[in-house]
Curated annotation (Swiss-Prot):
Originating organism: Cupriavidus taiwanensis (strain DSM 17343 / BCRC 17206 / CCUG 44338 / CIP 107171 / LMG 19424 / R1) (Ralstonia taiwanensis (strain LMG 19424))
Family designation: Belongs to the YqgF nuclease family.
Main location: cytoplasm
EC number, as in UniProt: 3.1.-.-
Official protein name in the record: Putative pre-16S rRNA nuclease
Amino acid sequence: MPDAVGRELPRDGTVLAFDYGEKKIGVALGNFITREARALTILPNITVEGRFEAVAALIQAWNPVQLIVGMPVNPEGGEQPSMKLARRFGNQLNGRFGLPVEWVDERYTSRAASMAGARRGELDAEAARIILQQYFDQFPL
């Protein structure tokens, strides 16, 4: 996962973040100027082609310069099965769309989204928003 020390944030551009799940993918949007994230949508994750057609439509609409994928690390920091799926999804995003992908530790983001008052149908998008905000927050102003 990224280490912000010594790295600079791009000056401008849109960022899409994904909270990957086997059934649904939460999506958030932000940009490097405001460094604020907002929940965007939830994509159904039924077929591989359907998933990437939906992502392609978002990329075409928002023209991001960076993609972020939440990495579901277990509470002790170790590997868990869903990490492989999230890592594969991020690698596929990079391969299909040629955009840089970074992973962000998503521990407890779904719980935080629920505690923040996100309704049941909005949890995945709100979790993606939290993931993206964590990404922005790791860089000093």
